[in-house]
Amino acid sequence: MVAVRGSHLLNPQDFVIEQWCSSLKLPTATEKSLIDAWYYAQAKIAEHADKMENAVLTLQSGVEMVEILHEMNMDSESLLTAMLFPLVANQLVDWEQIQEDFGPKITKLLKGVEEMDNIRQLNASHSANASQVDNVRRMLLAMVDDFRCVIIKLAERITFLRDAENHFCEEEKVLAAKECSNIYAPLANRL
């Protein structure tokens, strides 16, 4: 099923994190942690403005991942991890900061999602046979301690594909689609 996410259509200047969190009807503690993470992300992006190509896209990616995971009834730790993952992916925070600011559980989830990114070493443009790709998928599932990492990574890939439509050249779009088709779509099917 394909759905258009509300956050995907928002004008970033008009986005109000408190209203958005309220619209999700989350428990108060989860809502507060997401709001705090949003402002944390904004501060980290501002600190690294010189190396950020598209700060708005980074923030929107976290919001959209949270929406996807919320629809899947994922827990508050998963939602918080999703909000923070774009910071990790863009290397705007280090592990000590995450550990100090969000604790060991969130740090472990973020590391698990980041480890799944190692799969990109198998370039979609290389002609891998079906058994090689299947072995890679099995390796992905085996290397994570927490299944939530896989779900969060799948949400991240969905947002990645949506962003690719507007920000990639045709060749990059094809490579992104092949990667998701070969690795992540069958992985999602297995779950």
Language model features with spans:
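Active-site helical microenvironments for divalent-metal-assisted chemistry
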Residues: 1-191
